[in-house]
Amino acid sequence: MYAPPFVRAFGIAVLAVLPSFSSPATAASLKSSGSSSSCRCFPGDACWPSPADWKAFNQSVGGRLIATVPLGSVCHGTTYDAARCADVKAAWPYADTHTDSSSSVLAPFFANQSCDPFLPRETPCVIGTYVQYAVNVSSVADIQKTLAFSQKKNLRLVVRNTGHDYFGKSTGAGGLGLWMHNLKTYDIHDYKSAAYTGKAVTMGAGIQAGESAATAFKQGLTIVSGICPTVGLAGGYTQGGGLGPLTTRYGLGADQVLEWHAVLANGSEITATPTKNSDLYWALTGGGGGTYAVVYSMTVKAHANEKTTGANLTFPNAGSEDVFFQGVQAFHDIIPAISDAGGTAVWTVLSKALSVGPVTGPNMTKATMDSIFQPVLQKLDALNITYSYSSGEFSSFYESNAAYDPPVVSNGLQIGGRLVKRSDFTGNPDGFIQAIRGIADQGGLVTGASYQLSSSLQHPPNSVNPELRKSLISFQIGVPWINTDWATDLHNQDLITNSFVPALAALLPSGGSAYLNQADFREPGWQQVFYGENYEKLLELKDVYDPNGVFWGRTTVGSERWAETEDKRLCRVS
Ligand SMILES: Cc1cc2nc3c(=O)[nH]c(=O)nc-3n(C[C@H](O)[C@H](O)[C@H](O)COP(=O)(O)OP(=O)(O)OC[C@H]3O[C@@H](n4cnc5c(N)ncnc54)[C@H](O)[C@@H]3O)c2cc1C
């Protein structure tokens, strides 16, 4: 499939005049752009593959090459279609719109207004920061051929699964994408190794959390995942750590991994387990997606369904703000008890309300859940705050989650993050309330995910940041994206980086750490903040498995050696 010429032409010609976003290195510190070999080849360069090259490559991958036609193309130029454009705009906030595309991403900032459906019709449709082409991967051979072609032609390679990444790691100007989304195999089987004996599932790299949960449930099984059904499991989620409703019960997503089946940058097909290629296993399991290899499938533990209680609580900020935040404090006070009882909670403080849910209690009765919440409800009654509380006991996590995990409308949240240990949180209750109140007052959303990782949870050594393991809460501080107001979006981005994240960091020793999947892409000192004590070893392994930097993404291990120039070309930093 090849794009209409206007899309390709504008994609190249107009790229340079698009609004730019900051990169970790200034243009001055980069080696010269143009077609310099220190930069990846870019559309318009002499080195860019000819139409005949693309045609031959397309044939070599069985016609699975997709030339990008941005979703917003129906809103511009000669392909404008009023009805379809209205449909695209209406669908834009829903994850499926982007996950089912070979190029679109959920974080609009990294689309850089390329062929933006919300821009006026007369604005040219440019491919811009979307990948130029993507291979709809169906086999290991597709991956190997794409890796070979991209390296032969010095192209920027982008591994993309669902496009959920908050850092824009699954898109890239002038990129050739490996689109993993349609690898949907799902094989439940018995597994035996030194580390684990029991049920397991081997899933293709395109399996999403909701698909996994539904299929496993029918077989009486539960698979660890996050709260969002559209996030992919084998990509950034598990490779980056993987928090979710079952974290306290079974450990992180990464802790479930028994085997990776992957392709290295040099094209070698490889299996990595705790005992075979164990250093690659270690790096892939927590060191961040899109860094060491292209994962074709992974094998993870499967747990038997068990009784699970779900709960939620909401109350508005309707009267005195002081009173509202006393209510929030009452909820904060029970967070350690939820973890101690084996549960997790997700909540968001907005300027107008507190919304708690899902609270998940695996192997917990409704009576236990209600007793944990009783002091909060009593306090809310005493404060005369009207609330809505609900809890329910189910025979499986799947059913509990279906009842208590609210639908996620996810497109376009800009975020920062901080991990908070129990002693820091319980030792300074007023400090956290004041910081959160200050953020909410300025229009920020403060989402918390609480959990507890006991040392009794067995897992092979992996590269998850130890700070993630030691924390009680992962805070995500967000500001909703406004599709029609880029200037305000940039202002909000500055608020996150310069005000919101520092407000939480100020409460933590040495400024604290953050979960590498849910944090600010402009985080200063991200190597330490995201990877902690593992960074040095992870960088050594990057040099072993990907010495030429074939895999690059903002804030991935070794990414500081490359940066984007003003025109978004990816170049080595001198
Ligand atoms: C709405 C929403 C809800 C979320 N909820 C949670 C949550 O509950 N818990 C949690 O821990 N995180 C959560 N996240 C964060 C999520 O885990 C990350 O965004 C993660 O990177 C998504 O992975 P993906 O593969 O689906 O996305 P993509 O954007 O496609 O990829 C993310 C990264 O993984 C790489 N990658 C993808 N596939 C492969 C592959 N096969 N091989 C090698 N590299 C690959 C990409 O190159 C990229 O670097 C959420 C994010 C969003 C937007």
Curated annotation (Swiss-Prot):
Domain of life: Eukaryota
Signal peptide as annotated in the record: 1-27
Molecular function via GO: FAD binding; oxidoreductase activity
Record flagged with keyword Signal: yes
Name of encoding gene: sor8
Keywords noted in UniProt: FAD, Flavoprotein, Glycoprotein, Oxidoreductase, Signal
Similarity field: Belongs to the oxygen-dependent FAD-linked oxidoreductase family.
Protein's pathway: Secondary metabolite biosynthesis
EC number(s) given by UniProt: 1.-.-.-
Cell division recorded as keyword: no
All residue ranges annotated as the FAD-binding PCMH-type domain in the record: 126-305
Disulfide cysteine pairs (residue numbers): none
InterPro entries: BBE (IPR012951), FAD-bd_PCMH (IPR016166), FAD-bd_PCMH-like_sf (IPR036318), FAD-bd_PCMH_sub2 (IPR016169), FAD-linked_Oxidoreductases_BP (IPR050432), Oxid_FAD_bind_N (IPR006094)
Free-text function comment from the UniProt entry: FAD-linked oxidoreductase; part of the SOR gene cluster that mediates the biosynthesis of sorbicillinoids, a diverse group of yellow secondary metabolites that restrict growth of competing pathogenic fungi but not of bacteria. Sorbicillinoids biosynthesis requires the action of two PKSs. The SOR cluster is required for the production of trichodimerol and dihydrotrichotetronin, with sor2 being sufficient for production of trichodimerol, but not dihydrotrichotetronin in the light.
Cofactors: FAD
The protein's name: FAD-linked oxidoreductase sor8
Disruption phenotype: Leads to the accumulation of dihydrosorbicillinol as well as to higher amounts of oxosorbicillinol.
Organism: Hypocrea jecorina (strain QM6a) (Trichoderma reesei)
Glycosylation site residues: N58, N112, N136, N266, N312, N363, N384
